[in-house]
Amino acid sequence: MKIKEVVCALERFAPLPLQDGFDNAGLQIGLTEAEATGALLCLDVTEAVLDEAIALGYNLVISHHPLIFKGYKSITGRDYVEHCIMKAIKNDIVIYSAHTNLDNAPGGVNFKIAEKIGLSNVCLLYTSDA
């Protein structure tokens, strides 16, 4: 399966328009034409997560929290985000994040939490542009 097919499946379940205005969900780094050799799921992208993906031979990391929230004028390795960006690119690892779009999706994170604590008649009251 190509990485772009994984991305399409994720976005069918949790469409990007469901993300809050502050968010940066979606494709973070990489090209999606390659065949997926494996996917590592995580809450946050860290160097340890990328090291594990490299050790396993996986070329896709799917995180809940986006690695990149702000624009960068240069990538020089001055912080952990830049280190992760450089490591992912150097090792041909695609990073995809499903954050508030997954939280807000019907059947997504918030709905699963409601289900686990026994709530019924759950619906999304509003979407936020905050």
Annotate each predicted stretch with a short phrase.
Residues I3-P17, G21-N24, Q28-L60, L67-V122:
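Active-site loop-to-helix "anion-binding N-cap" substructures in soluble metabolic enzymes
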Residues Y126-A130:
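Conserved small/polar residues in nucleotide/adenosyl-binding loops
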